[in-house]
Swiss-Prot record:
GO cellular component labels: helical viral capsid
Main location per the UniProt record: virion
Lineage: Viruses, Riboviria, Orthornavirae, Kitrinoviricota, Alsuviricetes
Localization per record: Virion
InterPro entries: Coat_protein_tricho/vitivirus
Name of the molecule in the record: Capsid protein
Keywords carried by this UniProt record: Capsid protein, Helical capsid protein, Virion
Length: 198
């Protein structure tokens, strides 16, 4: 329960941060954008490239509207600069002295917005755009591209299909193997450097 409460707190803080300069409207059925469109676009674009420190995030992008489809395009409703908003999130995690975002990674700050990313990736997959993870893990990525992002652990498991849950499990298994291999490599490098110093 504490994990859920922390996730809710993180969502409230990050939502306030990223929407600070945004101008959402209450009725965006024909023009403009609402909070959900804005959050779907932001976290969807983050999901496309990942949350790694090495990830190069998008610059200025169109906010994707509700009529987006392969036939009509993305139904642009405004602009946002994804890399700037990611920078604000990272800065916040090192600037605060207490609270749930203190020292949080970008992935941890994005997890409460996993459903927003999922909704965005469903639309993007229809248009032929997939996350980097989906293109790397093509066998799984081809089946359920909308769950192929590194903060998918924030999704509600009960809302997923069995196929989506299976793909997430395979993806997380691969990520853990990769992280484990990096840890071993870093440890070996560290030991090698110490031996040279002696």
């Amino acid at each position: 329960m504490a994990h859920y409460a922390k996730r809710v707190e993180i969502r409230a803080i990050i939502e306030e941060l990223v929407l600070a300069k945004a101008q959402p409207t209450d009725d965006a059925s024909e023009s403009g954008y609402d909070r959900n469109m804005y959050l779907n676009t932001l976290f969807g674009y983050i999901a496309l490239v990942g949350t790694s420190k090495k990830a190069i995030h998008y610059g200025e992008v169109d906010i994707v509207g509700p009529k987006a489809s392969k036939k009509t395009g993305i139904d642009p409703r405004g602009k946002m600069v994804v890399s700037e908003l990611v920078g604000r999130m990272r800065t916040l995690s090192v600037a605060v002295s207490e609270g749930p975002v203190k020292g949080a990674t970008l992935r941890q700050m994005c997890e409460p917005f996993a459903q927003n990313a999922y909704d965005f990736l469903v639309v993007m997959a229809e248009m032929g755009t997939y996350s980097q993870l989906a293109t790397k893990m093509t066998r799984s990525g081809f089946k359920e591209p909308q769950v192929m992002f590194d903060f998918a652990s924030g999704l509600d498991l009960k809302a997923l299909t069995l196929q989506e849950a299976t793909v997430i499990q395979a993806m997380h298994s691969r990520l853990f193997r990769t992280e484990g291999a990096k840890g071993v490599f870093n440890a070996q490098s560290s030991i090698g450097e110490q031996a040279v110093e002696i």
